[in-house]
Amino acid sequence: MANYYGIGRTNYFAVKDAELFKDEMANYPVEVVTREGEDGTTLYGLLDANADGGGWEWSYVAELEGEDGEVIETDLEIDWAEVFARHLVDGWVAILMETGAEKYRYVSGYALAVNSKGESHEINLSRDIWKLAETLGENVTEVAY
């Protein structure tokens, strides 16, 4: 049995408040990277830090305090579009991309673009390429073995 290995990263983008952004990212399995923009401002990007090599995480374990003060661990969903919209400077677009494969059996790709208003577009290669391929001809086979 083969394992899926994915890798993900974002483009670089400007954030409203660097400390708030970095504080929130500390909750997620990501590495924050920076580079200098053309105007000298610091731009931020993310690299997936999934220890299993699976690409972007869509949930994380959070420690919440129960009614009696005990710490409860729970899985919480990560809505990346909402996260980026909350932090992006107006006019900037964050793009989250992931590619991966399970040997040569399944090859996949995903991209999400989102702006500060929360408007977004996504591409899922495993889903979207079929619609395009069928416009070119009637004989289209699966990309797998």
Predicted segments with their positions:
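Charged interaction segments
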Residues: 38-145
